[in-house]
Structure formats: structure tokens, C-alpha cells
């Protein structure tokens, strides 16, 4: 790419960088040493289906299979020029938003949904790839927040407790009954968000912990990316969207 074209690409990419990119695709790369999960964002689903965007995502995947890149920042640096050129070609903000890399100690299972907008990695401490794959599929489907109940973020737990306490107080019941109401709701909440406490998606009569116990396995790490998770999207009318695309 010549200096002038490079300058134009960089300028356009800089202008569009502040625009919300909450669509896109998930890519998964696996080697004998590690597995990687990355989210690559575009502004619209239309752009996410563009052949140039798909080619870019495939290049990122191939790069991750050949290079042990351990942060989204480093991955962005590796692809900055190509990303800027893609922004110029497609006319949308394109970002490599996040990356998670897991060492292949024990077994690592991966799951990528058919639309490539949801992916998961789960590593376990034993050599059982089929189990790891089942767990990755479960993580994608059930969206656990933590591996065990002890791993739940304390601020999240306290916020939930406060909500349940307020609900109990509004019930007007006796104090001891209200305490039991809160305890019951907290217990159910922890069971719902904890990986090992959830019913296994392939066999709802069995908890994940029971599945692990059958093989003497434990979950080491869990990572789940859904395209656009946590990104606040501003509602715009059609005319505004068209005008913005022309900038």
C-alpha cells in the first residue's frame, strides 16, 4: 500500500473509530499448544457478511494458528494496516475487540455456533476432549457467569441480595420468613449462574458437577464470547444511519 493510500485509510479509520461496532463474528483458532477465541466487530450484520470482512476474519484466525498472540492489543497491532484498509473498503468501523488464549494443558474444548456469533472455550484438567467439547457447548448455551459458586463476583452477589431483600420487605411477611425467602432466592441465583451447578444441556437431569465427577475432572478455565455483549447500541433512525455511512 502506498503512503498516500495508507494515509487515507488511517484517516477514514480514525473518523469511524468512535462509531459503535456491535455486530461481527467470533473466530476460534486451535493448535497443539493453545486455543484462542477472538471477537471481531463491524457496525452491521450486513458488513459482517461482506466477503472482505469474512476474508479479514479468516486471516486473523490463520494468524492466531501460527502466532501465539496473547492480547487483543497485540492482535490489533498485527492487523492495524489491514483493518484500516478494510474500514476504507467497507465504510464501517471494524475492530478486533477481545481475545482469550488458553494453554492446552489437559484438554480444551471449543464450540462455535453456526452463525459464528457465539463461541466458547473450556479447559479441563484431564485428557478427555469429548468431555471438554460438551462443556464448551454447554457454556455457550447456558452462559454461566462463574465456574463455582465461590467464584461469583462479590459485587454482583451483593447487588442480587439487595434486590431480594427489598422484594422480601415489600411482601410484609415476618422477619424469619423474609430471611428464608432471601436465602432461597440467593441459592437459586447461584445455582443458575454457576457452571458446575447448572443442569447439563444434553442431559438436564444431571448437574455439570455430576458429569465432571464421573470422569474425575474439574474445569480449569472458561471463556464465552457473544458478539456485541456489553456494548450499548444507540438507536438511530434510517436517515441518520445513511448520513453517517456517507461520512
Could you describe each region identified by the protein language model?
Residues 4-247:
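N-terminal assembly/interaction segments in proteins that build large macromolecular machines
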Amino acid at each position: 500500500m502506498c503512503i498516500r493510500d495508507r494515509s487515507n485509510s488511517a484517516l477514514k479509520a480514525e473518523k469511524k473509530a468512535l462509531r459503535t461496532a456491535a455486530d461481527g463474528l467470533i473466530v476460534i483458532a486451535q493448535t497443539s499448544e493453545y486455543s484462542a477465541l477472538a471477537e471481531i466487530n463491524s457496525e452491521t450484520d450486513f458488513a459482517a457478511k461482506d466477503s472482505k470482512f469474512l476474508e479479514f476474519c479468516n486471516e486473523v484466525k490463520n494468524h492466531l494458528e501460527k502466532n501465539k498472540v496473547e492480547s487483543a492489543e497485540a492482535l490489533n497491532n498485527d492487523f492495524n494496516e489491514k483493518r484500516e484498509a478494510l474500514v476504507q473498503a467497507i465504510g464501517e468501523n471494524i475492530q478486533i475487540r477481545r481475545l482469550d488464549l488458553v494453554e492446552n494443558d489437559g484438554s480444551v474444548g471449543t464450540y462455535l455456533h453456526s452463525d459464528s456469533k457465539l463461541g466458547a472455550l473450556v479447559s479441563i484438567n484431564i485428557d478427555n476432549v469429548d468431555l471438554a467439547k460438551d462443556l464448551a457447548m454447554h457454556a455457550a448455551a447456558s452462559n454461566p457467569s462463574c465456574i463455582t459458586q465461590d467464584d461469583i463476583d462479590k459485587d454482583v452477589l451483593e447487588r442480587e441480595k439487595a434486590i431480594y431483600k427489598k422484594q422480601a420487605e415489600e411482601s410484609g411477611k415476618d422477619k424469619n420468613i423474609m430471611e428464608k425467602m432471601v436465602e432461597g432466592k440467593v441459592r437459586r441465583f447461584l445455582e443458575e449462574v454457576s457452571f458446575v451447578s447448572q443442569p447439563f444441556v444434553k442431559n438436564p437431569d444431571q448437574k455439570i458437577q455430576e458429569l465432571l465427577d464421573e470422569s474425575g475432572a474439574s474445569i480449569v478455565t472458561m471463556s464465552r464470547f457473544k458478539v456485541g455483549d456489553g456494548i450499548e447500541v444507540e438507536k438511530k433512525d434510517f436517515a441518520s444511519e445513511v448520513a453517517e455511512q456517507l461520512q
